[in-house]
């Protein structure tokens, strides 16, 4: 049988035309080297900075993703998010065309997730309806609103001397074991009933420490409005570096919808160390203390996203669904110093970015003054405008009393005879110092805090023995709760002290003092 060339070509043409092959055009590359979680990939010509790259799946079928950080002439330097032991030279890498995203929304509340938003608390999957990119541009100047609403931490020393406002960035800084995390956890616990969603980001901590924090929050009933993002010390440096941005995106979801959120980064020193590790492995040139040149930008772009946004921004973002509401994201970053050295690279960076700082000192902590806040060098640059009238009116003298007391106490060690005015100041300072002590996980409502501040300001404690001051305070609180509940309710609602309330409060403290022995 002789085949006609024309027939053959027609047959081939018809076959080609009828071919229904599905094609997936994706940029692919090849792994050149894998070291310490850093992968060099050749052949990805259209990759974006910060894009997610898809690597071969693990043995149990879990997808493995990486983050493209270095775009060089011949290769791409990527960091693996998760396990990388199964990746070898010659493996195929695909571009996804997506920037790293994490799930966001109210479905995450009450859960413990990793840096990628995957649940790690054993309570089943999270059915979040939305995801959002972890790297976002902070709201512009026009979109912002000035800080004028308080975040009540429930800690006397903070709410009276270094108040925090909604949308503020207030740094908590101190050596290890000075109670930094305790201050942050107290602030979360005190948000119960304040319409505030909290995000706690644990970076580079021991898994046992994170477990203890979650247990404390559960015991206080705070997990019902809290998301915990955990990147423990056992996780890769990349996951620790990414976790802060993931937590920020989860908090921004609420800010952009006219709600209030509080985020705690515990702590940014470890995030900077993780980023330094990633940068050095990527062969980026080291600078001061071996940190890369953009370590300031690492923290500034994160903390600038904490802001109070105006009603127009919220309305525009929600396409008119939410009107007349401002949103806020308040940040309490934590920095750990080495032997009180606040002039190191990362501490000075973060101090310059934030709107104030709370210094915690080892000496005060060891002396039993907890929270160990140094009133002299702790400041809040914008929180004063947000402080409630009630606390603002009563806390004016506290800071001065403390500062003068610390100064005089140093001189008094050398002086044998002191005049009455100095002795009076020392006595007042000792009582104020004693009164600002507070048990962990026992934040105070604003009304009881006002009663405490009023009693010391008006001299009710001047003849009470210093060792009995805390007993006086707890007894007074119990007395007010049982006999003057209406007054406390009035103070909570009005957040101001009018003449009638002041007279009633003075009478109540006077009545209690007579019975106090």
From Swiss-Prot:
CDD domains attached to this UniProt entry: ATP-synt_F1_alpha_C, ATP-synt_F1_alpha_N, F1-ATPase_alpha_CD
GO cellular component: plasma membrane; proton-transporting ATP synthase complex
Site (Required for activity): 378
Superkingdom, taxonomy of origin: Bacteria
Swiss-Prot/TrEMBL keywords: ATP synthesis, ATP-binding, Cell inner membrane, Cell membrane, CF(1), Hydrogen ion transport, Ion transport, Membrane, Nucleotide-binding, Translocase, Transport
Record EC number: 7.1.2.2
Membrane-topology annotation of the record: Peripheral membrane protein
Location in the cell: Cell inner membrane
Catalytic activity, reaction form: ATP + H2O + 4 H(+)(in) = ADP + phosphate + 5 H(+)(out)
PROSITE patterns membership: ATPASE_ALPHA_BETA (PS00152)
Any one GO molecular-function label of the UniProt entry: ATP binding
Entries under NCBIfam families matching the protein: atpA, PRK13343.1
Subunit note: F-type ATPases have 2 components, CF(1) - the catalytic core - and CF(0) - the membrane proton channel. CF(1) has five subunits: alpha(3), beta(3), gamma(1), delta(1), epsilon(1). CF(0) has four main subunits: a(1), b(1), b'(1) and c(9-12).
UniProt function note: Produces ATP from ADP in the presence of a proton gradient across the membrane. The alpha chain is a regulatory subunit.
Protein's name in the database: ATP synthase subunit alpha
Organism: Methylibium petroleiphilum (strain ATCC BAA-1232 / LMG 22953 / PM1)
């Amino acid at each position: 049988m002789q085949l006609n060339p024309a027939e053959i070509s027609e047959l081939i043409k018809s076959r080609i035309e009828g071919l229904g092959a599905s094609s997936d055009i994706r940029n692919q590359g090849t792994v050149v080297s894998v070291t310490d979680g850093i992968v060099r990939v050749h052949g990805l010509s259209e990759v974006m900075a910060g894009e997610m790259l898809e690597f071969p799946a693990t043995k149990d079928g879990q997808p493995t993703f990486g983050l493209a950080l270095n775009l060089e002439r011949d290769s791409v330097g990527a960091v693996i998010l998760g396990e990388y032991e199964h990746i070898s030279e010659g493996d195929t890498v695909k571009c996804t065309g997506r920037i790293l995203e994490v799930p966001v929304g109210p479905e995450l509340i009450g859960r413990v997730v990793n840096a990628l938003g995957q649940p790690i608390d054993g309570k089943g999957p999270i059915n979040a309806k939305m995801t959002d990119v972890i790297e976002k541009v902070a709201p512009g100047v026009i979109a912002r609103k000035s800080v004028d609403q308080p975040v009540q931490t429930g800690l006397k020393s903070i709410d009276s001397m270094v108040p925090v406002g909604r949308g503020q960035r207030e740094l908590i800084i101190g050596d290890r074991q000075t109670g930094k995390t305790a201050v942050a956890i107290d602030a979360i616990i005190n948000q119960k009933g304040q319409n505030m969603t909290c995000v706690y980001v644990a970076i580079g901590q021991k898994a046992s420490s994170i477990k203890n924090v979650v247990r404390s929050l559960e015991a206080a009933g705070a997990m019902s409005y809290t998301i915990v993002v955990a990147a423990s010390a056992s996780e890769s440096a990349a996951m620790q570096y990414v976790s802060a941005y993931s937590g920020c995106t989860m908090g921004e979801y609420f800010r952009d919808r006219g709600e209030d959120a509080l985020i705690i980064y515990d702590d940014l020193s470890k995030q900077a160390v993780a980023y330094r590790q990633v940068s050095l492995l990527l062969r980026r040139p080291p600078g001061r203390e071996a940190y890369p040149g953009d370590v300031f930008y690492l923290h500034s772009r994160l903390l600038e996203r904490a802001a109070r946004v105006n009603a127009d921004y919220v309305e525009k973002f929600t396409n008119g669904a939410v009107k007349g509401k401002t949103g806020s994201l308040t940040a309490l970053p934590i920095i750990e110093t080495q032997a009180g050295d606040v002039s190191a690279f990362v501490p000075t960076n973060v101090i310059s970015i934030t709107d104030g700082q709370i210094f915690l000192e080892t000496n005060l902590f060891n002396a039993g003054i907890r929270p160990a806040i140094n009133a002299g060098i702790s400041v809040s640059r914008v929180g004063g405008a947000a402080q409630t009238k009630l606390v603002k009116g009563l806390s004016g003298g506290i800071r001065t009393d403390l500062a003068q007391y610390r100064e005089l106490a140093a001189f008094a060690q050398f002086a044998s005879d002191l005049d009455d005015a100095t002795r009076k100041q020392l006595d007042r300072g000792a009582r104020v110092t004693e009164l600002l002590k507070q048990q962990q996980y026992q934040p105070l409502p604003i009304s009881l805090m006002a009663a405490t501040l009023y009693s010391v300001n008006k001299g009710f404690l001047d003849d009470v023995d210093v060792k009995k001051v805390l007993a006086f305070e707890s007894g007074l609180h119990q007395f007010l709760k049982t006999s003057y509940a209406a007054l406390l309710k009035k103070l909570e609602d009005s957040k101001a002290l009018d003449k009638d309330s002041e007279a009633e409060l003075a009478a109540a403290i006077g009545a209690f003092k007579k019975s106090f022995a």
